[in-house]
Regions:
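Rossmann-like dinucleotide-binding core of oxidoreductases
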Residues: 1-9, 13, 17-19, 99-116, ...
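A Rossmann-like FAD-binding core segment of flavoenzymes
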Residues: 1-69
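A structural signal for short hydrophobic beta-strand segments in well-ordered beta-sheet cores
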Residues: 24-27, 77, 135
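A generic structural signal for well-ordered coil/turn residues at beta-strand boundaries
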Residues: 30, 66, 81, 129-131
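Hydrophobic residues embedded in beta-strands of well-ordered beta-sheets
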Residues: 32-34, 86, 142
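FAD-site-proximal beta/loop scaffold in flavoenzymes
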Residues: 41-108, 112-116
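Active-site-proximal substrate-binding core of FAD-dependent oxidoreductases
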Residues: 115-157
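C-terminal auxiliary extensions adjacent to catalytic cores
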Residues: 144-181
Length: 181
C-alpha cells in the first residue's frame, strides 16, 4: 500500500495510467486488452505485468512444501523442523519479495550462522526481512525502497545521484561476480 500511495502522484505527473488490485486472468494482445479475475478489462498501449511467482515443482513432488515453497523459519532461515537445513531466496515461503537483494541479505545471515555454528556451536544472527530495491523513475532519476518485517518502505523523492548510484552499483556488482574486481 505504501508504495502504491507514493507512486500514484508520480505516475499522474508523467501521464501513466495504472491499476492496482487487478489480478490478470488473460491478455488479448491482438486487441490490446487485459482481463481480470474480477471480471473487468482494461485496454493498454504498453502492458508491464509481473507473472505470478511459482515455487519449484521438485519441492512439491518431494513433499517438502506446498505450492513449491519450502516452509522456512522467517528469522533462522532454516527449513521448518530441520535446523540443519538452510533455505534462501526464491525457494522460501517467506513474506518478502523474491529479489536478488532479499536473497543477498538472507545469504549473509546464513553464511554467518554456518560459520558461527562451526566455530562456537550455535548460530548468532537472525534475518529481519531486510529488502533493498532501487526504483528507476525516468529522466535519469531514481529512488529506493528499504524495508523489513517491522518497517514498511520509506520512499524518498527521486533524484539524479540515486540514478547514477544504481547504475554504478549494477556495473560494480556484475564486475565483481565475474571475478574482475
Amino acid at each position: 500500500k505504501e508504495v502504491a500511495t507514493w507512486v500514484k502522484p508520480h505516475f499522474e505527473r508523467m501521464g501513466i495510467e495504472h491499476e492496482t488490485l487487478f489480478n490478470i486472468k488473460e491478455v488479448d494482445p491482438e486487441n490490446k486488452v487485459v482481463r481480470s479475475e474480477e471480471g473487468t478489462e482494461s485496454p493498454y498501449d504498453l502492458l508491464i505485468a509481473i507473472p505470478p511467482h511459482r515455487g519449484m515443482e521438485v519441492v512439491e513432488q518431494n513433499g517438502m512444501g506446498d505450492g513449491g515453497w519450502i516452509p522456512t523459519d522467517r528469522f533462522k532461515l532454516t527449513m521448518n523442523g530441520h535446523d540443519n537445513v538452510y533455505v534462501v531466496g526464491d525457494t522460501t515461503n517467506l513474506p518478502v519479495s523474491k529479489t536478488g537483494s532479499a536473497a543477498h541479505f538472507e545469504a549473509e545471515v546464513i553464511a554467518d550462522n554456518i560459520a558461527s555454528t562451526i566455530k562456537i556451536g550455535a548460530p548468532v544472527r537472525e534475518y529481519d526481512g531486510k529488502v533493498y530495491c532501487f526504483i528507476e523513475t525516468g529522466h535519469d532519476s531514481a529512488t529506493y525502497a528499504m524495508f523489513n518485517y517491522q518497517n514498511p518502505p520509506d520512499l524518498k523523492e527521486p533524484n539524479k545521484p540515486m540514478h547514477w548510484f544504481k547504475t554504478s552499483y549494477n556495473k560494480m556488482y556484475w564486475t565483481s561476480v565475474r571475478g574482475l574486481l
